[in-house]
Amino acid sequence: MSDLLHEKMDYNFLDSILKVIKETPQHKYQILTKRPQRMRKYFLKNEIPKNVWLGTTIESNKVKSRIDLIRDLDTSVKWISCEPLISDLGELDLSGIDWVITVGESGVNARPMKEEWALNIQKQCKKQNVAFFFKQWGAWGSDGIKRNKKENGALLKGKIYHAYPKEKKKIVI
């Protein structure tokens, strides 16, 4: 996985990728970035293919403002990836957002995700009618023990949350 909107990524390269995306309408493409300001700049000037879902990463409360940069983009699905979730996000305005994925951090230096952080997001998604997908705990389990991420699983309070968004039909005039 890479960030197609990274500062070192040339917009001409993105043009060539989007050409292929347009030629393969049978597939759905998720474009995720930590640089939604670049995403916004590009897609306010360029067509967003119908089979593209645009998203941004929100790993901590410090970067919540990224949501505002994708909220009004004309795409069939706008989504947020809280991966890795490393702090409580507090109150979220999910208006205009269709899907939120929450994931704990993996790897040797992984930081723990607290259950209440994930539950806070899940409850807000439910309240605001946004699809919620809890992918996995990562290296730290809900019990605060570090182990293999597969052992920690993907249950949140004993439930699997694997909701997907409904795509909005784009109106072509």
Model-derived regions: residue spans:
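Core AdoMet radical
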Residues: M1-Y42, E47-S87, D98-M113
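Auxiliary Fe-S-binding modules of radical SAM enzymes
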Residues: I86, E91-I173
